[in-house]
Amino acid sequence: MFTPQQDPHLYQHQKKTLTQTFSMLCWNVHKENMHPRFHLQLQQLLLKHPSDFLLFQEYKMPKHLPHGLKDFSYAMAANMETKRHIYGLLTASSFSFESRYIELTHAKELLFSTKKSMLLTSHPFADGDTVHIVNMHGINFVSFKVFSQELVKIKTVLQSCEDKMIVSGDFNNWSKRRIQALEEFRQSLSLEKALVQEEHHIKRVFSKPIDHIFYRGLKLTRAEAIDTKKVSDHNPIHAVFERL
């Protein structure tokens, strides 16, 4: 394992702007996305829960083989690379990408000596208005002080973003202090927390849910956690948004 040297991206929908209603699927796939059972589960999910955006954490991308997202444009924020694979965040969409920005944590996780990443992408409506999509995986296996410092670092980046925003991912907020730090992060960016149906399907650590969706400037039509029968150690959250 070593520091990533590339952040793959492919844009093939650059003439397709956001629609007034759009949907997303957020999922920590636990590096399971190359298994046939994952592809079968994803196909079934997308048939029942069509999604314009896929926000994956712990995505495993082969360097020299097809990766299974041929119908989507995508951007990746890698936090780890090996001879054959790249790992990290992946945001895929059937809409155009206006920009992307990648932020790696300064600190490394103690057990694996890897950093975590944040991927910020922007997607335009036809009139030029923009939605910022933030895909996050909060750092783990560090002190609370380091966790909090990394959140502040990301907050500073996002404070420069105006307009509509969705922040989603695995935040690793499994303690009272981490929950409070994330709540302060949410409030500082004027974000609302999505109320998720079937919340008991959300991944929990020490009985605390760690996968979340936050948003502003949009109407949340619905959000639902979906039981995928342990394809990953997390379940996906599907959400539908409308432009105000």
Describe the predicted segments one by one:
Residues 38, 75-93, 110-114, 173-238:
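Active site of divalent-metal-dependent phosphoester/diester hydrolases
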Residues 1-9, 51-130, 226-228:
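Structured beta-strand-rich core segments of catalytic domains in phosphoester-bond hydrolases
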Residues 1-23:
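Acidic, histidine-bearing metal-coordination/catalytic regions of metal-dependent phosphoesterases
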Residues 22-29, 42-65, 121, 132-136, ...:
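Active-site beta-strand/loop signature of hydrolases that rely on acidic residues for catalysis
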